[in-house]
């Protein structure tokens, strides 16, 4: 059987949704009567299309999920996770400005999962480099999170575990 990570960690901006929550949209957010999520100005807010399936797949595989975001819009990011009904997937959330290394040190401390047993999905190369130095398997996202990217990430993790 393919080895699975003990923790899958996701950035939020340009990984789960196609914007920066602290600059491109205007919190607070709400869910309209038609079920769409909107910002204060009424702008429609959406996830990348396959994000709910990605998180559901990890849940079905028994892989816990965490968030690691450097946004300064902490309340808005958490609000969006709840409005999109994604909060149920996340066992930990590290959402605050600063180095992603700090986010991962706290995730390690809170979960007990070794860095080598984590996989991390992020759109910013600097975060990939910094977190990769900890021994985390890092996957650089280019066009938002998708099932294909998840599959590639899990394969990369399994190969790293096998020493390939």
From Swiss-Prot:
The active site is at residues 11, 13. Keywords: Hydrolase, Magnesium, Metal-binding, Protein phosphatase. Substrate binds at residues 20, 70. It holds the Pfam family Acid_PPase. Its EC number is 3.1.3.-, 3.1.3.48. Mg(2+) binds at residues 11, 13, 123. Inhibited by vanadate and zinc, and slightly by calcium. It is an enzyme of class 3 (hydrolase). GO terms for molecular function: metal ion binding; protein tyrosine phosphatase activity. Changing residue 138 to S/A/G: No effect on enzymatic activity. It comes from the Eukaryota. Optimum pH is 5.3. It catalyses: O-phospho-L-tyrosyl-[protein] + H2O = L-tyrosyl-[protein] + phosphate. Changing residue 122 to N: Abolishes enzymatic activity. Its cofactor is Mg(2+). Phosphate binds at residues 12-13, 69-70, 100. Changing residue 69 to A: Abolishes enzymatic activity. Magnesium-dependent phosphatase which may act as a tyrosine phosphatase. NCBIfam families: HAD-SF-IIIC, MDP-1. PANTHER family: MAGNESIUM-DEPENDENT PHOSPHATASE 1, MAGNESIUM-DEPENDENT PHOSPHATASE 1 MDP1. Belongs to the HAD-like hydrolase superfamily. This is Magnesium-dependent phosphatase 1.
């Amino acid at each position: 059987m393919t080895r699975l990570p003990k923790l899958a960690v996701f950035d939020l901006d340009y990984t789960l949704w196609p914007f920066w929550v602290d600059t491109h949209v205007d919190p607070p957010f709400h869910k309209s009567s038609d079920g769409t999520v909107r910002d204060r100005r009424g702008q429609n807010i959406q996830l990348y299309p396959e994000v709910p399936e990605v998180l559901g797949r990890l849940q079905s595989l028994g892989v816990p999920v965490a968030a690691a975001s450097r946004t300064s819009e902490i309340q808005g990011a958490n609000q969006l996770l709840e409005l999109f009904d994604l909060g149920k997937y996340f066992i930990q959330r590290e959402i605050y400005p600063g180095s992603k290394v700090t986010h991962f040190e706290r995730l390690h401390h809170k979960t007990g999962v070794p860095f080598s047993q984590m996989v991390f999905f992020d759109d910013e190369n600097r975060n990939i480099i910094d977190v990769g130095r900890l021994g985390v398997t890092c996957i650089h996202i280019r066009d938002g999170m998708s099932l294909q990217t998840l599959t590639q990430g899990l394969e990369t993790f399994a190969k790293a575990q096998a020493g390939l």
